[in-house]
Structure formats: structure tokens, C-alpha cells
Amino acid sequence: SLSGGSLAVNPENSSILNREFNCFVCGSKQKVKAFQLKPHTQEANRNIFGITSYLASMEGHDYIDFNKIRIITCPTCLFSSINKDLFRKTEREKTPDILTNQKFRTAWIKDVKNRHASLAGKMKELDSLNPSGEAVIKSYELAIQSASMLGVANNDESQKWQAVTLLMTLAEIQMNNGDVEVAESYLEKARERADNLFKNAGHAIVSFKAARLPLFIGL
């Protein structure tokens, strides 16, 4: 059994480390399972949007498309993120400021039942190294919703930008699957959000990234 965010090699894939956390948002005792990619195990490439795609494994390592399994999801309240620092590693760990926002916590917990219903029994797949395409989309939708709500409640532009990058990663996954039309629809959603962020951003770096994105999408 893993504790305190400690690492263990996944028995199915030597390139993946298993971790367990707890959820800051709902405080459930239920373990939050997460996968971590071992460094230098995959040949990776960044596209023009800065999104990493995993092309092949390095010699002597198992292949994994880490984008498909990188979202960490609490099985109780379904709070989801790619950021492991938003999950509790030890009992004594202080809750990150962004997660102490009562407005966010209340809104998130209030809608848990609907969120579970929309997941439609896919939770088990989120713990798998081979989730279905539908389960991958659901996990990203949960992470996008989490980042968007955190961004609005805390007026945090970096969280709002994370929702944009998650949409672009989802587009990359769909492109690799050959679903060009679906990929383009995610890119369009990312462009709309980036446009909106650029108009309202006070954060210089976020504003710069948001301004560049529509240019890249137009290439």
C-alpha cells in the first residue's frame, strides 16, 4: 500500500510510477490514484502550441501515451487536475491557498451527484493504463471544469489558462487518433477561451500566450 505520495513501479508498464494521494477539496479518506511518467522513458515532441505528444518509447522501456492517463481524479468528489500539488501527500500538508476558497468548494461539492452521473460508470477506467477514448475525454472534461471553476472563484488567470492547455491537449490526443474534426472543435473552444482571456487578462504572461494562440491555430 502506498502512502504519503510515495512511488511504486506499475506492474503493467515499467515507464509508469503509481502514486496515491488524498483529496483536499472533499477531505474523503478514499485514496486518489495517480500515474507519474518516469523521466527519459518516452520519445516526446512538442507541437506549435507547446503541447507534448508521446511518439514512441526509448530503448528498453515500455511505451505509454501519457497524455491519456495524466489527469488525477478524486473518486469521491471528482475534483481533477494534472497538478499533483493540488492533492494531499501527507496528513500535515497545508491546503494550497487556491483550494481554500469557500465559494469554489461549495460550488464543487454541490454538483458531485450530477458529475458522477455524467461520468456514466467510467471511474474504474480512469484508474486504468488503457482507458477508452470516452473515458479520456471525460477525465479531461472534469479537469477543465475544475480549472475553470478554480480560475473564476479565485480570479486566477493561470488556472483559466490551464483549462485552455487541457483543451489543446485533448485536441492533440484526438488528432493522434485520426479524429481531425473532433480535434478541430477542441482547438476552436481553446481559441475562444484564449480570446476571452486575452481581452481580460491582467497577467502579462497569460495575456501573451492567449494572444499568440489564435495566430497559431490560424496557421
Regions found by a protein language model. Give the residues of each.
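N-terminal cysteine/histidine-rich coordination modules
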Residues: 1-100
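A near-ubiquitous, low-amplitude feature marking generic local secondary-structure context
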Residues: 5-9, 13, 56-60, 119, ...
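Generic detection of long, well-ordered alpha-helical segments
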Residues: 12-16, 133, 183-184
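Short, Lys/Arg-enriched charge-dense amphipathic segments
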Residues: 57-63, 110-113, 179-183
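Amphipathic alpha-helical interaction segments
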Residues: 81-88, 174-177, 194
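Amphipathic alpha-helical repeat scaffolds of TPR domains
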Residues: 100-149, 154-179, 208-219
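Long C-terminal interaction/binding lobes of large macromolecular proteins
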Residues: 186-189, 196, 200-219
